[in-house]
């Protein structure tokens, strides 16, 4: 989000899911779209099989989409900026750029041109292991397409250079004029059904709603006037900084809502140690998860079918959610719990229904001003929707970028924070699988899903497994400099030599006991996708 906001002025999917069918070429990277966003993957596949669209896939794993790819760029994990800058280099060197778009709608092109000059196919191959010829072919496919679309997810962002990698993708779209039209754009596929909505509503430590900045006096005054309070001008803390604060004693109490850091955060031993130092830990959730087990107080929340409200999905579509069943026991809507807590602490909040909160959102959020429960009763509306007469905005940046001109950012390849060595010779990358969801608080309660993927596993290349004497299905121990887990080996060529993959859904073999706490300095996202590990058979 920070990368797109810097480049375009808006950190969201530029296009709509339905108009992806009009793409002539897709560049998909950092996204196992078939397993993590299957509906979107079906649109991509239809464009390929029915319209003849081309697919450039950049992924270190042999995922299902590889069989649909015209070119598969199998990069080393953590080398994304190098190969993206390589594409930029080729497009500029071979005069494949959209000169009119660059001149009329962007700035800082000359600095970009100078910066990417060294990223020749040969130089990129030395970093990424992508054959130079494949990189050239990909550059031509993307630049010469009538409409080319970029899709990416957390495989791009969960690195110490994640923000810069997204800026590089934005550079690529602007360089070729692939923005603001059907079938084009830069499209982040969000990790959960309402991540976009949560960010829109200010669930980011630096922002109010609609990405107005906490540190900006004019922005802050707007919310002070609306709420009748004085607001702290200092931005809040990101999750890594919160855990750090708990460890140092700077943070004494913590309320965790709908989050499971004892599964989702890196270096879980450190997380557990830090949370244990709190004077008070309150967890608000629908099930007692691994984090809830450490809590002093647990507040029972409502599940999606038990409450009213809206979700804003990955294409910025605000959709209505209606209560279908009553919540069990003492479970309450999140807004009700927060209202009760606030009033206990001396506030005078008068919310009595979710609709009143939506009306407040309309009053302080320009991009949601024209979105009401009545208007989104059926199909939802895509923001920005500034008036009650406005139809919504399926495609962003058609005539002008949110920031005015699009900004070409200079980015450089920086190696991952942790490198392999003789003691820890394998690169571990992590992610999701089709049959489980995030920390599996909900999905592992489904026997149907559990039956498909009953236990934790690690993908390892057959050549590597052979050298270690490991057979498919055998128990193995995987260790990093931070911890160890035991799980089963899944021996197949889905990963390249020297790389292993473990999904993060399994509490009995929580892969985040291994991952590193290094973070992107801008977005503060941990580097979940690269750390060094060693592997041995269990005796």
Language-model region placement:
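Acidic, glycine-rich segments within the central catalytic cores of soluble metabolic enzymes
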Residues: 197, 207-211
């Amino acid at each position: 989000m920070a990368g797109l906001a810097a480049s375009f002025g808006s950190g969201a999917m530029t296009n709509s899911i339905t108009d992806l069918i009009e793409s002539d070429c897709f560049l998909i990277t950092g996204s196992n779209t078939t397993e993590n966003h299957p509906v979107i993957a079906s649109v991509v596949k239809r464009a390929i099989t029915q319209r003849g669209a081309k697919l450039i896939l950049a992924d270190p794993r042999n995922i299902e989409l590889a069989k649909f790819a015209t070119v598969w760029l199998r990069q080393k994990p953590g080398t994304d900026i190098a190969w993206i800058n390589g594409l930029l280099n080729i497009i500029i060197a071979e005069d494949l750029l959209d000169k009119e778009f660059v001149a009329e709608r962007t700035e800082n092109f000359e600095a970009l041109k100078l910066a990417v000059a060294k990223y020749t196919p040969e130089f990129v191959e030395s970093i990424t292991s992508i054959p130079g010829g494949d990189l050239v072919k990909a550059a031509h496919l993307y630049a010469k397409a009538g409409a080319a679309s970029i899709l990416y997810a957390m495989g791009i962002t969960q690195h110490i250079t994640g923000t810069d990698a997204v800026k590089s993708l934005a550079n690529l779209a602007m360089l070729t004029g692939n923005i603001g039209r059907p079938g084009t754009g830069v499209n982040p596929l969000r990790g959960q059904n309402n991540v976009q909505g949560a960010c829109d509503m200010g669930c980011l430590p630096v922002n109010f709603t609609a990405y107005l900045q906490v540190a900006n006096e004019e922005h802050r005054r707007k919310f002070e006037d609306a709420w009748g309070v004085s607001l702290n001008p200092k931005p809040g803390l990101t999750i890594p900084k919160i855990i750090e604060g708990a460890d140092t004693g700077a943070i004494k109490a913590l309320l965790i809502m709908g989050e499971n850091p004892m599964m989702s955060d890196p270096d879980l031993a450190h997380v557990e140690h830090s949370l244990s130092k709190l004077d008070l830990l309150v967890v608000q959730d629908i099930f007692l998860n691994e984090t809830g087990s450490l809590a002093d107080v647990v507040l029972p929340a409502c599940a999606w079918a038990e409450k009213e409200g809206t979700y804003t999905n990955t294409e910025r579509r605000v959709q209505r959610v209606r209560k279908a069943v009553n919540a069990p026991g003492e479970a309450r809507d999140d807004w009700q719990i927060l209202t009760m807590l606030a009033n206990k602490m001396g506030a005078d909040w008068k919310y009595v229904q979710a609709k009143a909160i939506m009306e407040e959102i309309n009053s302080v959020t320009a991009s949601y001003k024209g979105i009401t429960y009545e208007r989104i009763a059926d199909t939802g509306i895509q923001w920005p929707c500034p008036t009650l007469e406005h139809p919504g905005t399926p495609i962003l940046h058609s005539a002008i970028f949110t920031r005015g001109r699009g900004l070409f950012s200079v980015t450089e390849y920086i190696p991952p924070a942790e490198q392999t060595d003789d003691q820890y010779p394998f690169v571990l990358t992590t992610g999701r699988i089709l049959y489980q969801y995030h920390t599996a608080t909900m999905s592992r309660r489904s026997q149907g899903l559990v039956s498909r993927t009953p236990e934790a596993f690690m993908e390892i290349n057959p050549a590597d497994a052979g050298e270690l004497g490991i057979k498919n299905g055998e128990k193995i121990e995987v260790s990093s400099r931070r911890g160890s887990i035991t799980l089963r080996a899944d021996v197949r060529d889905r990963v390249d030599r020297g790389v292993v993959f473990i999904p993060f859904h399994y509490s009995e073999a929580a892969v985040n006991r291994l991952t590193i706490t290094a973070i992107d300095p801008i977005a503060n996202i941990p580097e979940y996708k690269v750390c060094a590990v060693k592997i041995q058979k269990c005796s």
